[in-house]
Amino acid sequence: MARVTVEDCLDKVETRFDLVVLASMRANKILKNGYSESMENEKKEKATVVALREIAESEITSEQILRNEIEG
């Protein structure tokens, strides 16, 4: 997927508002913990783009994001 759009992500979450919150949580987690080895090609992209791509491609679910946020 060359470009991530909101429409790609809305299939995975209920509303645009949920998408904003979840993507920001995931982007903050990426910035805090750094890019993993599996994200090596994505280091050129901003964390928000990586987070949106993960959501769109179902690499991470809203439940996983929320669980990670609660666990710290």
Swiss-Prot record:
Its EC number is 2.7.7.6. InterPro entries: DNA-dir_RNA_pol_omega, Pol_omega/Rpo6/RPB6, RPB6/omega-like_sf. GO terms for molecular function: DNA binding; DNA-directed RNA polymerase activity. It catalyses: RNA(n) + a ribonucleoside 5'-triphosphate = RNA(n+1) + diphosphate. Disulfide bonds: none annotated. The keyword Transcription applies. GO terms for cellular component: DNA-directed RNA polymerase complex. Keywords: DNA-directed RNA polymerase, Nucleotidyltransferase, Transcription, Transferase. One of its GO terms (biological process) is DNA-templated transcription. PANTHER family: DNA-DIRECTED RNA POLYMERASE SUBUNIT OMEGA. Promotes RNA polymerase assembly. Latches the N- and C-terminal regions of the beta' subunit thereby facilitating its interaction with the beta and alpha subunits. Belongs to the RNA polymerase subunit omega family. This is DNA-directed RNA polymerase subunit omega. It comes from Francisella tularensis subsp. holarctica (strain LVS).
